[in-house]
Amino acid sequence: MYPYTVYMTLTYSKPLNPRTGSNRVSNRIFKGDVLGRSIQMYRMWFLFVRLGLDCEDNNIPIIDHVNNKKIKVKVNKKFYRKWDLDRVKEDKFDDWWKDKKHLFIETEPTLVNEIEDDDNYYYIKVDKRLKKEDVIRGVRGLIKPTKTFTSEYTINTQHKYLPTHIKYNIFIWKHLGYTRKEIIDLLGGSYRYYYKVRIPKDESSIRRSLRSGERLILSTSKGVF
């Protein structure tokens, strides 16, 4: 049996109900702003940074089950210097986002009067008499697709919202002292309406989700989400 059993109190993080009642899970447009991913994934990024801060401030280690040791969580303050981490600890995401969204918004096309010498931009002449659909079709034909983003902070991994949300809750429930069997019951209640997502239904799958969530806390704390 693994030698470490860690149940420590979290200060800032609490279990959350999933939010999938709209197209916000997949839509990259949020309140008129263009994002690299859906707003719900930025919400999860925020919550996992908060978890990292929680672990750091409360000396909650992540268990390395391969090497039988504890890993101290330390959030990269230099990387997250513009996030205002004291607010991440206490603010609701929606309030924080209002002030910080400029860090995550993608550059949008604009009308220009002067051309800048910048290789990051295309300058395209468009006949104003064309229909919008024809303009879009023409631009798509001219510009090669790219996987890069223009925002200052970008999501690097193709996370899925509900599985990430489940990992988040499992980690918190575990540190609230719930057993794996109790967590299975909690999952069945919180995610009972989401038939398209695979919900952990036995203790071994709870363990795998917990370890995956712990790895995500470590990578997020380093600046990779």
Segments (PLM) and residue ranges:
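K/R-rich mixed-charge low-complexity regions
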Residues: 149-225
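DNA-contacting interfaces and partner/effector-binding or oligomerization modules
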Residues: 2-150
